[in-house]
A protein has these predicted regions:
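Core of compact, soluble alpha-helical bundle domains
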Residues: 23, 27, 31-36, 50, ...
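Hydrophobic alpha-helical connector segments
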Residues: 69-96, 101-102
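Amphipathic alpha-helical packing segments from all-alpha helical-bundle domains
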Residues: 102-149
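C-terminal peripheral helix-coil segments that are non-catalytic and often amphipathic
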Residues: 153-201
């Protein structure tokens, strides 16, 4: 094995191994030994690469996010594209959300999401935030995260085109959201619900 861990080389193997293992059992039942053996690693190499199952979740999600960031130019397109990676790995993420490790995944999603909305603000030349705007940023992303989690945990499958429509046609624009104090997380979730009723069979 190489001295340095190259996530670009090993993460596709991790994806494949987890998908196979989670077809038979749940995430909580997986051990470092079972994951390492399915990937073809020694336990020592697994611990060097990920430290533990929590670090594996963080690295897995950040790897999927980074793949989207590298492809598109605007933050909004980046985020939409990374949602598709999550949906493509639905079995893995659904199992994690159903496990005792769910809080860790919520945390890393939330942290990534805040970076996303701040990057989008900078892209749109919104250089600073009032306290009220910062609070609404958090509501905005919590609404988006709720949509993503409900999609993964539910039976619906959103295509890339459907995700585009949700963001562009049904959720308030980012700048309008910063200005409009009446826009809340409940309003965003209401718009998502109405979209589902109209478009998802």
């Amino acid at each position: 094995m190489e001295n340095e861990v190259n996530l670009d080389k090993i993460m596709p193997k991790v994806h494949s191994a987890l998908d196979k293992l989670l077809a038979k059992t749940d995430f909580d039942s997986l051990t470092v030994k079972s994951i390492a053996e399915e990937i073809g690693f020694s336990r020592q190499y697994f611990y060097r690469a990920f430290a533990d199952k929590y670090a594996l979740i963080v690295d897995l999600f950040e790897y999927d996010m980074q793949r989207g960031v590298e492809i598109f130019f605007t933050p909004r397109f980046c985020y939409l594209h990374t949602l598709q990676y999550i949906l493509d790995s639905k079995r893995i993420y659904k199992s994690i959300f159903s496990s005792s490790y769910a809080t860790y995944l919520y945390d890393v999603m939330y942290n990534y999401g805040m970076e996303f909305v701040r990057a989008m603000a900078e892209y749109m030349s919104v250089r600073s935030f009032t306290k009220e705007q910062d609070n609404r940023l958090r509501l905005y992303f919590l609404g988006v995260t709720s949509m993503l989690v409900k999609t993964i945990m539910g039976s619906e499958h959103f295509t890339k085109e459907e995700l585009d429509r949700i963001f562009y046609d049904n959720i308030p624009s980012f700048v309008d959201f910063l200005k409009d104090e009446t826009v809340t997380r409940d309003y965003i979730l209401y718009k998502i619900m109405k979209y589902r009723e109209a478009h998802i069979v």
